[in-house]
């Protein structure tokens, strides 16, 4: 079974149309996949079913994820050039209110960067120190029933970090996380 997983970056905002704003794209894609007969399922359910011989999924199953877990995943925020942005969670809520029962499995998974130090460094280096990479919202997002939180990585292996979990201190992409030991280091650090 092939299952599409559509991924968005809530900080991907350079305008207010489909091609330049992942919030606009996500809201549009929710409508599109529903009209096309796809059934949205929580990513954790898909994984459970794929690894459990007794689990079943609808034939046209799809999942949604958000990468890097900025505060735009959870809260409506003003973008400095594109104006007010509806959060990914509130887009899910809006869809559920507009289409009651249309997607019983409505859910998205936000992949978070576990290290508070990495989030702070990335916020300073990549988001001009706007304070948009917090973890205070994670429990409330999960409690909504519409969003899950999963581990993206410990430190994003980001070049702005003084030290990363990667064994040779190679930074800038995930291609150098190429051994079980490096992957385990990311998981071990996140579990602390």
Could you describe each region identified by the protein language model?
Residues 1-3, 163:
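Short hydrophobic/aromatic-rich motifs at helix boundaries and adjacent loops
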Residues 3, 10-146, 157-158:
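Active-site beta->alpha N-cap acidic-glycine motif
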Residues 8, 13-15, 165, 169:
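Amphipathic, alpha-helical segments enriched in basic
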Residues 77, 82, 139-143, 155-192:
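Alpha-helical scaffold elements lining the catalytic groove of polysaccharide deacetylases
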Residues 147-152:
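Non-cysteine beta-strand/loop elements that form the S-adenosyl-L-methionine
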